[in-house]
Amino acid sequence: MKNMSCKLVVSVTLFFSFLTIGPLAHAQNSSEKEVIVVYKNKAGKETILDSDADVEQQYKHLPAVAVTADQETVKELKQDPDILYVENNVSFTAADSTDFKVLSDGTDTSDNFEQWNLEPIQVKQAWKAGLTGKNIKIAVIDSGISPHDDLSIAGGYSAVSYTSSYKDDNGHGTHVAGIIGAKHNGYGIDGIAPEAQIYAVKALDQNGSGDLQSLLQGIDWSIANRMDIVNMSLGTTSDSKILHDAVNKAYEQGVLLVAASGNDGNGKPVNYPAAYSSVVAVSATNEKNQLASFSTTGDEVEFSAPGTNITSTYLNQYYATGSGTSQATPHAAAMFALLKQRDPAETNVQLREEMRKNIVDLGTAGRDQQFGYGLIQYKAQATDSAYAAAEQAVKKAEQTKAQIDINKARELISQLPNSDAKTALHKRLDKVQSYRNVKDAKDKVAKAEKYKTQQTVDTAQTAINKLPNGTDKKNLQKRLDQVKRYIASKQAKDKVAKAEKSKKKTDVDSAQSAIGKLPASSEKTSLQKRLNKVKSTNLKTAQQSVSAAEKKSTDANAAKAQSAVNQLQAGKDKTALQKRLDKVKKKVAAAEAKKVETAKAKVKKAEKDKTKKSKTSAQSAVNQLKASNEKTKLQKRLNAVKPKK
């Protein structure tokens, strides 16, 4: 913490007690006043715009126009049949009960303030379940939000007339925003929903005061920009029909509104807009879970939350402590964000019902005027323990990087209901799996480099294919390609050598295929020359065999020639030799047919003569035949001949 003499405690007076409502004195003429005119239809709106009134503000989602007008113009507008009603532009103030006390400027990141308020609401259990308010949009309608290292502001809007900036010039809005969403960065404070998208909607001025016109503008902006939750740590003691209509409109559009009950003390009526049924009214509790002395109570109070001595972010990178239902309200708004993250599809009604399951009942049993349904307190669900187990498994996988631990974590994650928390766990595990995949690929490439077998190469290639495109994949593929080239070269050499030895066509074809896979090189050229010699030898052998068969047309020579021709690769030479050999085969076949006819004649003669001489002659003719069905038949006939004695 930055050293301060006598421990600097600066009081910044922000609190303005809730004022008795009346017309604002902003008009230049005492006969003029600021009013909100609510119209029934388009004609009513045109009537307002065409009147003598000065238009201050038009709204996108509210049928109203804020104007400054004299009494006569206001009277005319009230009497117009297309005008629904006219209301005075009344004032609002921030709902603080004490002055802020500045603690530190936060320049020393070792600052880590005590936050008693987190324990009663058990929010750490929600964090363990992965609930951080991620993707939930929260509008803080307040004095704006000041830039702070402990805050992330998603955007904002200024509804006040004196500046277009939504930067906080009071401190109240920044304090509220920190309670909701201060970062979990190891210093300062921890917000209840640190990953919620916080929007600064400036409707209060540097004194913490505002008016109905600006508040309506803030609500209108929240509807237009699809806020999930609106925090209103402000209020007034008088009812407003247009404000009531505005919050109802927002509620119907799916915006959950949370507001401070007020700081007028027990027994005083709940302030507006918290008093409306479409708004969640929040009272404040102290360190002893008792009602804060300043907290307004009433039937409208729905929940209570810590609101005394709350430390949060402040102007100029400082931190400060403050008390009020202003501080209690953001506790509830942030808790709603956690519940909304857990069940994004739930309606406002369902969320309010769900919050009733996440309370500890204080005071009279059931709902009462002081605490409503009770103090908000996160209740762990069965899914929380499942999430915790999955997260623990992911942590183990992150530490060990073992595939068995990765698989176990993935199985546990798969059993979780769909949520941002589940997606976050998946992303963490995907990083571990990516690391593991790279390591596996490196190990398998190294193994392929060592053993240089096709199996190790195939295994390494499969591992590389799992990697995303990038430097690791590119470098590993280069290394594996070198191994592939080595193996391809060795295979080509071995196959060429085998072809040289066997001269078989299958070996020659295999060698040719292996050579074809090699990149152009002197080695490839040399291997091709060696293989071409084998092909030339086979061609010469086939040519000689065919010539021999042509010279002496025997079955044996024809068969030998056919075997030699079969070893040749397809081409003109093989085709020409096969044609020559086919002629030889026809000649051999003709000679064989002649022998068959001769044998048939002699067998027939032996059957007729039945002499030993004719049978011997027939047997000699049959013996000269090639094995065939015809030869078998002739032999059976001859065997049946019994020579005469």
From Swiss-Prot:
Residues 28-103 form a propeptide. The keyword Signal applies. Its main location: secreted. The keyword Cytoplasm does not apply. One of its GO terms (cellular component) is extracellular region. Residues 522-547 have a biased composition (Polar residues). One of its GO terms (molecular function) is serine-type endopeptidase activity. It holds the Pfam family GA_3. Residues 490-577, 591-645 are annotated as: Disordered. One of its GO terms (biological process) is proteolysis. Its EC number is 3.4.21.-. Induction: Expression is sigma D-dependent. Expression is positively regulated by DegU, and very low levels of DegU-P are required for epr maximal expression. Negatively regulated jointly by ScoC (Hpr) and SinR, which bind to their respective target sites 62 bp apart. Spo0A positively regulates epr expression by negating the repressive effect of corepressors, SinR and ScoC (Hpr). Spo0A binds to the upstream region of epr promoter and in turn occludes the binding site of one of the corepressor, SinR. Residues 115-382 form the Peptidase S8 domain. Changing S326A: Loss of protease activity, but mutant is still able to swarm. InterPro entries: Epr_GA-like (IPR054725), Peptidase_S8/S53_dom (IPR000209), Peptidase_S8/S53_dom_sf (IPR036852), Peptidase_S8/S53_subtilisin (IPR051048), Peptidase_S8_Asp-AS (IPR023827), Peptidase_S8_His-AS (IPR022398), Peptidase_S8_Ser-AS (IPR023828), Peptidase_S8_subtilisin-rel (IPR015500). May undergo two steps of processing in its passage through the cell membrane: removal of the N-terminal signal sequence and cleavage of the C-terminal domain. Several active forms of Epr with molecular masses between 40 and 34 kDa were found in the medium of B.subtilis cultures. The size variation of the active forms expressed by the complete epr gene appears to be the result of partial removal of the C-terminus either by processing or degradation. Requires Ca(2+) for stability. Activity is inhibited by phenylmethylsulfonyl fluoride (PMSF) and EDTA. Serine protease. Involved in the production of the competence and sporulation stimulating factor CSF. In addition, is essential for swarming motility. Plays a key role in DegU-mediated swarming motility. The protease activity is dispensable for swarming. Not essential for growth or sporulation. Belongs to the peptidase S8 family. PANTHER family: CELL WALL-ASSOCIATED PROTEASE, SUBTILISIN-RELATED. This is Minor extracellular protease Epr.
